[in-house]
Amino acid sequence: MMATYIFLGDSLTHGYGVPEGQGWVELLAHDLAFKGSCMENHGIDGDTLQGMYNRLERILSAQVRAPEPYKSSGLAEGNASKTASILCLLGGTNDILMGRSADYCFKKLQGLVGLWEDSLGMDRVDLISQGRGLVVALLPPLDYDPFDQNPILEAYNAKIRSYAENRGLALIDFYTPLKEASDFGLVVYEGDVHPNSLGYKIMYQAAKELLLSL
């Protein structure tokens, strides 16, 4: 689908820890399957779900743009709130690392979804019919987990999955392919919560498959 994509998240969306061009959003931006589309990477290292909410308010009021949106030929200029077709939400890892619960994270995610839908003045069915979609994503597992926080992350992911199914929202599963690759013995992390180049490539493949199905 030729569209404008807004990727809102933290360092996992930003592509922290790998050379420029190897984050999953950047890989999508340079994939010919998305030629003519615009990829706006609004990932900020260390951000929380509340921070994402605050930034989404500014994005929708056209006060903020991604510093360097990845653009390819054929896309008309315009601000994100007017031209955006797809919003992709990936957040909560930093909240969990700060000791927040799965319930807290889920309520914040619901707030983000509500803000997006309310800003356009229409319900989800109308959003999809007009090409203004919403995608939520499951968090990758924590590779370094000294405080046993993966169970909280998994509970949060379960809530996201159920919510997406009940609301009919598109869902990117980043958790399963990264866990399976790690369990298989592949090194897909930099030694902490951030994927390495292979890990981001796996995320890119999962995102590409979902986005092309919309």
PLM regions: where:
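Alpha-helical cap/lid subdomain in secreted, periplasmic
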Residues: 57-214
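Serine-esterase "nucleophile elbow" of acetyl-processing enzymes
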Residues: 1-62
